From Swiss-Prot:
PANTHER family membership: METALLOPROTEASE (PTHR11851), PROCESSING PEPTIDASE ALPHA SUBUNIT, PUTATIVE-RELATED (PTHR11851:SF227)
Cellular compartments annotated: Mitochondrion inner membrane
One matching Pfam family: Peptidase_M16
Superkingdom: Eukaryota
Subunit: Component of the ubiquinol-cytochrome c oxidoreductase (cytochrome b-c1 complex, complex III, CIII), a multisubunit enzyme composed of 3 respiratory subunits cytochrome b, cytochrome c1 and Rieske protein, 2 core protein subunits, and additional low-molecular weight protein subunits. The complex exists as an obligatory dimer and forms supercomplexes (SCs) in the inner mitochondrial membrane with cytochrome c oxidase (complex IV, CIV).
Keywords: Electron transport, Membrane, Mitochondrion, Mitochondrion inner membrane, Respiratory chain, Transit peptide, Transport
The keyword Nucleotide-binding is assigned to this record: no
GO CC field: mitochondrial inner membrane
Summary of the function given for this chain in its UniProt record: Component of the ubiquinol-cytochrome c oxidoreductase, a multisubunit transmembrane complex that is part of the mitochondrial electron transport chain which drives oxidative phosphorylation.
UniProt-listed InterPro entries: Metalloenz_LuxS/M16 (IPR011249), MPP/UQCRC_Complex (IPR050361), Pept_M16_N (IPR011765)
Entry protein name: Ubiquinol-cytochrome-c reductase complex core protein 2, mitochondrial
Transit peptide: 1-42
Family to which this protein belongs: Belongs to the peptidase M16 family. UQCRC2/QCR2 subfamily.
Amino acid sequence: MKSVVRSKGTQALFRRFSSALGDSINPNQVGVGDNVIRVNGRLFEVDKVQEKGLKTSVLDNGTKVITLDNGGSVAQLTFLYKDGPVYENIFNAGISSFMKHALTKDGLTSSEYITKTFLQKAGIIVHEPTVVNKSAIAFTVEGFRDTLAQPAVADKFWQSLLFPRFSPENVKEVKRLVELESKETKRDSPFAYLQDILHKTAFKGSPLGHTSFVPAYNLGYIDSNKLFDRWDAHYGFGNIAVIATNIEHEAVLAAITDSAWVARAHNKVGGVAAPASKYSGGEGYDVVHRAKEFDDQFTDVYSTYTAYAFKAPGRSNLKEHAASLVIAQALSNAVSPVLNTSFAPKRLEVFYQAYDTVGLIGLSSVQASNAQLKAFKAALSKIGTLSEADLAVHKSAALLTAYGNVESWRATQATLIDSFNTTGQPLSPLEIVSAIKAVSADTVKSVVATMLGSPATLVHHGDSPCAPTLDALQ
């Protein structure tokens, strides 16, 4: 490794770093790429070799800001990840494989999706891990100064992305396994050993609420006491659910750009929202909150509803809006036997919420399940294949509702009118009736195909059967 001459102040910091880490590290034998190391909740700066005269500065939370030649800047923050020679094998396997195994459990969306989709939207790059010594590696994230400069982001949000969590009841087992590894127990495959530990311990129990968390293999080295102990909000991006904690929500949202579809869900007890382990990824649509394990801890499981939905046409396109009304009616017809024969914990309700240019067609349910969402998607897919004759019964049912709206409209002397506009004038319920009559199987097929082109997303979790709002479409 290249030798770097460091100031006395930096060497003093590194001696403190070495002491806290419990390893003997020569401060002059550190890789060029290492910049900030966090140990026991404290940040230790390691001077970065100046290249091309670039200026650097360190913010209060340890983020290093590098000023570029063009006047711009880039921010970097490094997290230390320590315990056992197994990390050398992790490094060789590459960050993608490591994050995949560390963050994937029961179908949780893979790290590739996290790094390529979510982090890109936030303007964040995760660099290849750097081996600090034989038993520690450092992950560096790089992004915008305004993003990484926020203490809430640096201390909590990025840790929740980079480090898997163990529930309290599994901490003892984790420590036992790590202790075995620290004694340099000979193993044929260290990486397989890591996978085994993660699959046996990660995300089990109830990783929620007012409980302490221990990042995998961290055991205090990254100041577990400062990790979050309660969930505040859920951020959904397409088919990935990223769980934030009690941080500055608006600050995080501001760091996410363009087309991210943000769905927020708040529970009445302690601001608790769904944990990462209760989501599953897989084929791209399979995102669902397994509500029972979550609800039992905080609220009455029989009165809390979870709603997930597909993006659908809004009200600005009359033809597609009418087709969406028929599709929603067909889905409702499909679940009506369940509505009629099941008791409260399995109650389902299909909804279509239409706004100006976008809408939601989804399913609200008590005790939502992964299988339920798959069945809902399958029903939606089948509707896209219906013939004109088969579609007729669903059009008739949609017309019954539309005619009911017409009668209400007439009874109030046309003061209740539909709110969307295609020609500059408000559209009346009579025009919606005409549009439903004109819906064709081809139009339904086209709308369904577009809906299935984007994954389902959690849009509501709370006391009411269904209350998704425009906030879910931001």
